[in-house]
Amino acid sequence: MSSVSGVRTPRERRSALRSLLRKRRQRELASKVASTVNGATSANNHGEPPSPADARPRLTLHDLHDIFREHPELELKYLNMMKMAITGKESICLPFNFHSHRQHTCLDISPYGNEQVSRIACTSCEDNRILPTASDAMVAFINQTSNIMKNRNFYYGFCKSSELLKLSTNQPPIFQIYYLLHAANHDIVPFMHAEDGRLHMHVIFENPDVHIPCDCITQMLTAAREDYSVTLNIVRDHVVISVLCHAVSASSVKIDVTILQRKIDEMDIPNDVSESFERYKELIQELCQSSGNNLYEEATSSYAIRSPLTASPLHVVSTNGCGPSSSSQSTPPHLHPPSQATQPHHYSHHQSQSQQHHHRPQSPPPPLFLNSIRAP
């Protein structure tokens, strides 16, 4: 009837209108995609980002949904390009090497799981919070003699050792990494020790829930370069970041060690700091020993050391997941053993035997923290 009279029925008019709207929507989407690609191409050709006046509108989620509905093959390509799960989270294994960190992801460590979280999906980061950069940390390193009290938590970790402090002035990344971590997490306890003339740092987080923003991680890696390995692990139920030096690069920055040492000697160590080192004494001893094993690339899976302050052996578990060993070995070089007169015969005999069988290179022993730190 409609073909005879030349008048369309309401159903035909609605069908034609839907067809027209569909074609118009497809043309608009195609023009958006083409303008986005052309804008990116022109920016790459000139080596500069497009100016705000030339900026093109970005595709919305609704636009992507319409495109994928019309072209399912593009949806598959888009999913193959994604390196993280759609949820924006990815579990990590410990110990975690920061050099394997994915860009633009934060770290969430808690008793419920350890994950890398995409920055856009992170609920802990604040948009208006500005963290320092590696350059800011270098400026703070240069001006540290004028900001002793501001960075006093860092100097407590030296236990007033002039040898360790002198090494730190030739290794700016140690201070830089601490400075960046402290800006993101204030409840940390750093301490230093030396192996073969190289300074290393371990940072203990006092809270079980730790969030490290992606900007902080990026700046830490910038400061560390290839000379330092930065790893995160959980040791004795505490989150620990270890910064181990592999090579000392020549630094053009010179710090007056005499002035720095004099100001640090004038500082009093608070009671709570002494108590924290007393509380972490076994953890500190374990980290010093395990870092020495990593640097010397020993294949020892587990060992036990005898603490000079306690009569019972201190079992140390290696970071590779093996259980504690029941056998005891010689006291590590950084733990001062008791005098020969107070040692039992079987302990002296065992120590002499272990020294004959183990020819480990000698290095400058770091101070024993528990003997160095005492409340005023």
From Swiss-Prot:
Alphabetized InterPro entries for the sequence: Herpes_UL31 (IPR021152)
Superkingdom to which the source organism belongs: Viruses
Cell wall biogenesis/degradation found in the keyword field: no
Stretches annotated zinc finger (CCCH-type): 106-211
Composition-biased stretches (Polar residues): 33-45, 317-332
UniProt-reported outcome of changing C122S: Partial relocalization in the host nucleoplasm
Compartment(s) of residence: Host nucleus inner membrane
Region feature Disordered, mapped onto this chain: 22-57, 316-376
Chief location bin: host cell
Gene Ontology molecular-function annotations: zinc ion binding
GO cellular component terms attached to this protein's record: host cell nuclear inner membrane; membrane
Processing and modification events after translation: Phosphorylated at serine residues in the N-terminus. This phosphorylation regulates the localization within the inner nuclear membrane. Phosphorylation by viral kinase UL97 at Ser-19 plays an important role for correct viral nuclear egress complex (NEC) localization.
A biological-process GO annotation: viral budding from nuclear membrane
Effect of S19A: No effect on replication kinetics
Modified residues (Phosphoserine): S19
Entry keywords, A to Z: Host membrane, Host nucleus, Membrane, Metal-binding, Phosphoprotein, Zinc, Zinc-finger
Function: Plays an essential role in virion nuclear egress, the first step of virion release from infected cell. Within the host nucleus, NEC1 interacts with the newly formed capsid through the vertexes and directs it to the inner nuclear membrane by associating with NEC2. Induces the budding of the capsid at the inner nuclear membrane as well as its envelopment into the perinuclear space.
Quaternary structure and partners: Forms a heterohexameric complex with NEC2. Interacts with capsid vertex specific component 2/CVC2; this interaction directs the capsid to the host inner nuclear membrane to initiate budding.
Family the entry assigns: Belongs to the herpesviridae NEC1 protein family.
Protein name: Nuclear egress protein 1
Gene: NEC1
